[in-house]
């Protein structure tokens, strides 16, 4: 059974590129264009990993993560952002974080590393 990944990014091109790369590796991928939509999807389906942009309309990655913690969801998380200082300011420096623009194959390597655990 393939691993399930949720890709959350309000930047359409970035989201589609990440999703395409993951599908090429035979992962099952869902997409959300903002944090609120991500929460709706997370309520309906379990994921092995969420790749989430930090700054988005409606709800940020921090809001999504807070909700996931309150619901005891055990989904692994990778953050992507153009504002890496926000990750440290919100106490999430223990999470893997890729600063935009980043190498897609570095991201793919991290995905594989997380999902084999």
Regions found by a protein language model. Give the residues of each.
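Short acidic/polar segment at the start of the alpha1 helix of CheY-like receiver
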Residues: 11-15
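Charged docking surfaces used in two-component/phosphorelay signaling
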Residues: 16-24
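Short hydrophobic/Thr-rich beta-strand motif most characteristic of the beta2 strand and flanking loop
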Residues: 26-33, 41
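Acidic catalytic/metal-coordinating carboxylates
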Residues: 34-37, 60-63
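Active-site residues of response regulator receiver
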Residues: 53
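Receiver (REC) domain active-site loop signature in two-component systems and cognate sites
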Residues: 56
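Alpha4 helix (beta4-alpha4-beta5 surface) of REC/receiver domains from two-component response regulators
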Residues: 63, 83-100, 105, 109
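Hydrophobic/aromatic residues positioned on beta-strands within the core alpha/beta folds
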Residues: 78-82
């Amino acid at each position: 059974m393939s691993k399930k990944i949720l890709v959350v990014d309000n930047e359409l091109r970035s989201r589609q590129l990440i999703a395409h790369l993951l599908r090429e590796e035979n992962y099952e991928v869902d997409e959300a264009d903002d944090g609120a939509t991500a929460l709706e999807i997370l309520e309906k389906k379990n994921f092995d990993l969420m790749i989430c942009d930090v700054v988005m309309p409606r709800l940020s990655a921090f809001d999504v993560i807070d909700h996931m913690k309150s619901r005891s969801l055990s989904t692994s998380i990778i953050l992507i952002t153009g504002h890496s200082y926000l990750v440290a300011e919100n106490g999430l420096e223990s999470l893997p974080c890729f600063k935009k623009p980043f190498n897609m194959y570095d991201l793919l390597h991290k995905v594989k590393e997380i999902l084999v655990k």
